[in-house]
């Protein structure tokens, strides 16, 4: 699998960079790159701060998101405790990347999230929202974006337990550390 992934990374790009600009956010100045996915026209966003060398380990967060949740609103004023903590870590290190992989709802994904919501509420978790789950295509999109912004070694910002990511070396990526937030 990893050889196939490596071949596709070199020969089949699924993204086109549509915007590349500096923006001022409530977290400070960041470089925003917007990528359009060639298979479905969804737009994914990479926000970066600082510079890094080609082989340097870089603080990285990859978010599943819905653009209808207004990512730009969150960056300029709306409060989001989780993102506040993530951007605080990036600012403290003075460099890093935060990716937003667009996962606008497809019918089946929405149905499965509703089923999960019912299970959570039966357990008494009435305000907990089922997470968006990334599928393997999303990892490929994220990997192509990381390749474009020259990140190969990742210090992943996550509160989830560490798990082996199948095929990640085929993407030319290496997870060197997990950082809780």
Q: Where do the language-model regions lie?
A:
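Catalytic domains of riboflavin
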Residues: 1-181
């Amino acid at each position: 699998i990893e050889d196939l992934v490596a071949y596709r990374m070199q020969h089949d790009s699924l993204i086109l960079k549509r915007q590349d600009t500096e923006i001022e956010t409530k977290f400070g100045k960041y470089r925003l790159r917007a990528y359009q996915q060639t298979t479905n026209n969804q737009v994914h966003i990479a926000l970066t701060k600082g510079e890094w060398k080609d082989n340097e380990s870089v603080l990285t967060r990859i978010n599943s998101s819905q653009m209808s949740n207004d990512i730009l609103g969150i960056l300029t004023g709306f409060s989001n405790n989780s993102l506040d903590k993530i951007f605080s870590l990036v600012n403290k290190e003075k460099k890093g990347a935060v990716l937003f992989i667009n996962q606008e709802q497809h019918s089946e994904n929405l149905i499965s999230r509703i089923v999960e919501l019912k299970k959570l509420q039966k357990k008494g978790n009435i305000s907990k929202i089922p997470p968006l789950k990334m599928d393997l295509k999303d990892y490929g999109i994220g990997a192509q974006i990381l390749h474009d912004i020259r990140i190969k070694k990742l210090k992943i910002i996550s509160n989830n337990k560490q798990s082996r990511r199948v095929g990640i070396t085929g993407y030319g990526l290496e997870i060197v550390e997990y950082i809780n937030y």
